[in-house]
Amino acid sequence: MTHVLDAAQTALRLPYPALAAEMAALLSDPTVQVPPRLVQALPGGGSLFVMPALDARIAITKLITFTPANAGTGRATIQGDVVVFDVATGGRRLLLDGPTVTARRTAAVSLLAAQRLAPNPDGPLLIVGAGAQGLAHLEAFAQGLGITEMVVASRSQASAEALAQKARTLGLQARATTDANAALADCPLAVTCTPASEVVLRALPREDGFVAAVGAFTPTMVELAPRLCRHFAELGRVFVDTPDAAHEAGDLLQAGLDVSAFASLGDVVRGSAAAGQGPVLFKSCGWAGWDLAAARVAVR
């Protein structure tokens, strides 16, 4: 029997600390297989993503569309589902809400990276982008790092204030701004989670800064200024979520950096890489393995 979960039910199955812990476990699981994802361009500028992954117990496929033109229209930019199958029987076990899985697993990856790499994990936290990913990162860092103070930056003051108000209802101190670059000086933690249609962060980080950039996942997308990326590479450390970032990380590729030279989150978890001195940039592009980790948590 297939259990079909809506967005709220999917969210309840995926607490952020458990997700981050499962991702760390997955990175050391030799049974995990993640074939290359299929990204098919759609008329009008959207994309169709087909993202399979499996381990010894379950197999999943995330089937979603990304429609950037929906931003600001009231329609979701990400729509679709995650189907979870039992490897032994071939039966379908779960149907999860795709946008909810995507938002929560992306934020949990950033959380895991911050737990392992952030020089100053106490905050305040700057969130650049006030959409679904902004909310997910707010919740993840509050639950997983105990952040109590944050700044929300968006081109729209109203959008920034709405997310800041949501943070206040969760007991956090929060303020809204339209100037992310000015706010960065006060925040050792930062996440950029925008549609990645233009540079949103140019200011250089603090010496104890950690920036997770999650919005850009193709070579043509960008959130961070090239000079900022090169600053991290020269005076700090750059990490990527997976080696696939070598052909997906638009921020780093447009900065002229050799992305294949950067350590991955798996290297960090397995102990072959560490942050060291200086500011840290974590570039996340997405991977079906993260969706598999979410499915592993959801089926428990």
Question: Model-derived features: where do they sit?
Answer:
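N-terminal ligand-binding/catalytic initiation module
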Residues: 1-103, 111, 118-121, 288-292, ...
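Short helix-loop-beta connector
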Residues: 117-124, 146, 207
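Glycine-rich Rossmann-fold phosphate-binding loop(s) that bind the pyrophosphate
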Residues: 130-131
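Short, conserved loop/helix-junction motifs that constitute active-site signature segments
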Residues: 144-146, 203-208, 228-234
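NAD(P)-binding Rossmann-fold cofactor-contacting core
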Residues: 144-170
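Rossmann-fold NAD(P) dinucleotide-binding segment
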Residues: 181-182, 186-189, 196-210, 223-226
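Rossmann-fold NAD(P)-binding glycine/threonine-rich loop
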Residues: 214-271
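C-terminal helix-to-coil terminal segments
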Residues: 274-300
